[in-house]
């Protein structure tokens, strides 16, 4: 889910509007190389924690953070959401997040139910979970390929 072609494909979806609604202290789950960073509304952000376990993506993510002018507010957290000890080192604790942002990430977590419980626990009362997940393709060839694979939709 990397690169400009993927980002262009998101343009005509709800993703840009959803990301722009993220506010306050934000936990971005699986930011990858930072595809969503240009979509943030900087005036609504206090702090962003990008929880990204794939350290091979961190260099590109840092470049994108800098290019988007978010270096003062964006912190890469080099672990998965299940690593409570590492999250706590960064100040990510229960009832601490205003927004949790998850764009096309939850399909790849090892234990979805546990992950959702953990995310909910991290949100402040009245916080928001901003989420967009993959849907079954309307393209006939892609739909055929998807139907041959396990595809929760």
Question: Predicted regions span which residues?
Answer:
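Class I SAM-dependent methyltransferase SAM/SAH-binding core
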Residues: 25-86
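A short SAM/SAH-binding and catalytic strip from SAM-dependent methyltransferases
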Residues: 97-112
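Local beta-strand N-terminus motif with an aromatic residue
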Residues: 23, 45, 94-98
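A short, aliphatic-rich alpha-helical micro-motif
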Residues: 19-20, 94, 116
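A short glycine-rich, Lys/Arg-flanked "PGG" loop and its adjoining helix->strand segment in the class I
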Residues: 113-128
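Conserved class I S-adenosyl-L-methionine
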Residues: 128-152
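A short acidic, Gly/Pro-enriched loop at the edge of an enzyme's catalytic core
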Residues: 82-100
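Conserved alpha-helix/loop element of class I SAM-dependent methyltransferases that forms part
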Residues: 2-25, 33-39
